[in-house]
């Protein structure tokens, strides 16, 4: 059966830095509950998505260092060269169907549990994520990062990005959302610093920008570099310079990543089922991003209708149609 030509736009290739997605269907990062214990099962799981036609297939969060140890919850990691082989299986499986493989590199900051490593969680100002957010994440009292800690975290990100490239990933992420370390630097209620990493919005984005720039310097010649960022809380914060702090953050970082992956803040808002959340539910929060940056933008929104997907692209809301559960169903 031939395809209706009005949907052809959904199958256009999209350039993401030095790599090109073969179409606009993008499986955004999502947890699978699979750890390093079952690499072949994990590879087969992601391969099924690529076989189904997704242009980009992403991992879930990959810890970059033992200071971001999410035990007792299951989690994946890219801590050292021993982890490269298992992720190479996944990349090879994804590539066998012509899709790109994306690695969601992750440091959880104050929200991790560290039940195995026993390392005090890292944070901008020593404030537990559970101080204002109730959820499944850790509630330990975190340490305040000094500038040496900041340099170390950036170095861990770079090392993990290089390992991701060695495994075969085409896109590597910096994660600044959902309560994790980059996001904690962006939010004034968690970032009380008085140095160049705190205070104004311009200072609060500095850590995220440095993470992006260091990652691009390390692997940007061969890998696309994506920023995953939560915008819901920032959109609600007034700014002296823009319509909201979300607008200001995106403007300050507009040229930094090769791809913007934009989302809501927490599971109840970000992951509500389509029977309860209407299509394009995220649009009122993320609709401004493409007006600020020339880089491609991916987002989700309970998409079930190809006509809605086409509309998102033609109206300049998204460049890539993101989904997680549709890639599993």
Report the location of each language-model feature.
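Flavin-dependent oxidoreductase catalytic cores
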Residues: 1-329
């Amino acid at each position: 059966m031939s395809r209706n030509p009005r949907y052809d736009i959904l199958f256009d290739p999209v350039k993401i830095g030095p790599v090109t997605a073969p179409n606009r269907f993008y499986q955004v990062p999502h947890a699978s509950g699979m750890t390093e214990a079952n690499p072949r099962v994990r590879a087969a799981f992601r391969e099924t998505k690529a076989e189904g036609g997704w242009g980009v297939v992403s991992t879930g969060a990959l810890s970059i260092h033992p200071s971001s140890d999410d035990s007792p919850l299951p989690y994946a990691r890219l801590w050292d060269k021993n982890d490269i082989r298992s992720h190479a299986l996944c990349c090879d499986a994804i590539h066998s169907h012509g899709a790109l493989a994306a690695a969601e590199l992750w440091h959880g900051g104050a929200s991790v549990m560290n039940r195995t490593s026993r390392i005090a969680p890292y944070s901008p100002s020593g404030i537990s994520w559970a101080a204002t957010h109730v959820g499944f994440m850790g509630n330990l009292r975190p340490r305040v990062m000094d500038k040496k800690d900041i340099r170390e975290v950036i170095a861990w990100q770079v090392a993990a990005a290089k390992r991701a490239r060695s495994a075969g990933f085409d896109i590597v992420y910096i994660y600044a959302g959902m309560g994790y370390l980059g996001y904690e630097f962006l939010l004034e209620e968690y970032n009380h610093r008085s140095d160049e990493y705190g205070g104004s919005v311009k200072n609060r984005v500095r850590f995220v920008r440095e993470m992006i720039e260091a990652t691009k310097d390390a692997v940007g010649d061969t890998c696309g570099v994506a920023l995953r960022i939560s915008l819901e809380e920032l959109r609600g914060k007034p700014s002296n310079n823009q319509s909201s702090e979300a607008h200001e953050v995106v403007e300050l970082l507009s040229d930094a990543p090769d791809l913007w992956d934009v989302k809501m803040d927490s599971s109840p808002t970000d992951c509500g089922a389509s029977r309860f959340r209407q299509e394009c539910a995220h649009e009122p929060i993320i609709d401004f991003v493409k007006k600020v940056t020339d880089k491609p933008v991916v987002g989700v929104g309970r998409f079930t209708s190809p006509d809605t997907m086409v509309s998102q692209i033609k109206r300049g809301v998204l460049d890539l149609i993101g989904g997680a559960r549709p890639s599993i169903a």
